[in-house]
Amino acid sequence: MARVKPFKGLRPPRELVEQVESRPYDVLDSDEARAEAGNNEKSLYHIIKPEIDFPVGTSEYDARVYERAAENFAKFQREGWLVQDADDHYYVYAQTMNGHTQYGIVVGAAVDDYLNGVILKHELTRRDKEEDRMKHVRVCDANIEPVFLAYPDDDVLDAVVARYTLQEPEYDFIAPVDGFRHQFWIIDKEEDITAVTERFALMPHLYIADGHHRTAAAALVGAEKAKANPAHTGTEEYNYLMAVCFPASQLTILDYNRVVKDINGHSPAEFLALLEKDFVVSPQGTEPYRPARLHEFSLYLKGEWYSLMLKPGLVDETDPIESLDVSISSKRILDEILGIKDLRSDKRIDFVGGLRGLSELKRRVDSGEMQMALALYPVSMQQIIRIADSGNIMPPKATWFEPKLRSGLVVHKLS
């Protein structure tokens, strides 16, 4: 069973939300954060990317940077830019992209559920990235940014959400950069709060969609605090991490594509011939071509697009990892033909998230920076759940969720 609880959110006043809110810390670099914050002292980037308060070139891992995060977090509360709710609430957070809206419930999710395998992951985490986020959680004594979870669709939760979204939202704005709409409501009726808690308690698992390092860091700091507290009861706020939970069917996963600097010494004709061992190769002309189904790939090479359709019978469709298109392309194209063994470390390959589209693949090849591009059919939420349920891990660079959660709509204090 999944254990969730309401919490007293720390939030910007309605009239300040668009000055406070930001993109997540891990989707932009320090220079971009500095530019987006500009002269806005209320921008959450001063808490989640506090290196922007220091001279250009200051490491984001400098001890002074973490200290500044804590100082700025205290300042935001002192100045009234973040104000704590008087009562425990759940919250509804809706995101609208290209006419599609997904409705999440903001909860405190039990740290123990992550440590004990109720909250399931599908990606490996890196210890250095975990430690960075742990330092941030420790100095702020808060989950400044939420993690992004998925849950099996539930009619009762849908009904609760629907009742609130008929009302005027607490926040309603179009975000800069992505241009998507973000709305936020407060679940404040006792019977609805009880219903949310009880419905989640019936779910055997929740699934991390995005934010594996934030989840691990929040859970590990929570466990640290529990161990260090001789009066620990299990009800303290540090036993919970802030998460936005969405019905799995509502989530949008975009293609996560590859661009490669060279084709390993092969001529284009040789490369295409090697592909024909495992794929039916079909020329598609000069207009961008998007894969239309599972096991179909799109190749851009020397100004031409090709469809690569995996030949039948080559993969075990019952194997949740082997049957993934990211696994097929990694093994049968990137490794066996191009000699790229490790996607994380090989400098010959780069990755292009789906929002930037096929035009970005074409641009990077046409510029001469890269020699070829490979577009994949998006992973489905069902595939992610199947892998998480089986205890497996997705290959690197497999999922690109969109839209990303905005940060700064609500913060969860740990004490």
List each model region and its residues:
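Surface-exposed, charge/polar-rich loops and edge strands
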Residues: 1-415
